[in-house]
């Protein structure tokens, strides 16, 4: 998909974003961020993968830097499955960006993760109706990712319909959809799980935030984290 392609928008009734690649083409996932373990992106301890690229581009999106289809680390599905399983968590959460704009390779990843007995949770800005229409129109890649997802969170973010009562969602229109009965406890966990925010500071001082919080609270948190702090030298006698 080129950068000049129009955004579909949260209210668009248009078809889904990028179509499957030509047969025989090498499929990779454009990964913007890989987080080994988190308790802020779904029930239990999960590995989270944010993909690069989104055709929806909801106003007020928390991750506008992930809209562009340029960038990200290109990772083969088999390598991504191995990284997820090596993390040793309860399952995989797919976010973005828009996972269904990379449905074909992500379906391969999800299938590999589920084959190892782990659960898959997928966030999408498309509505369930849009996904169903895409499947009816012959989008086998979309059907495959739906078939390998245990818990779907569907619907665009709507800034004028903020949801502060349910975990993991940003607006009241977004819905939890349990796909199949393999992991029925996932949906039950929604009512028992609080919103969380996790802040990671790397060795170079870079700050990464994931999870869910109201904008004002998040701004205050980031300001406090970014504020220079006095340093105290420490050492250990041997």
Q: Where in the sequence are the language-model features?
A:
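N-terminal [4Fe-4S]-dependent radical SAM core
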Residues: 1-50, 59, 63-69, 196-198
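Conserved Radical SAM active-site core
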Residues: 27-36, 45-46, 62-144
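A cross-domain feature marking catalytic cores of carbohydrate-active enzymes
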Residues: 51, 96, 122-124, 201, ...
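Short secondary-structure boundary segments
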Residues: 124-125, 155-157
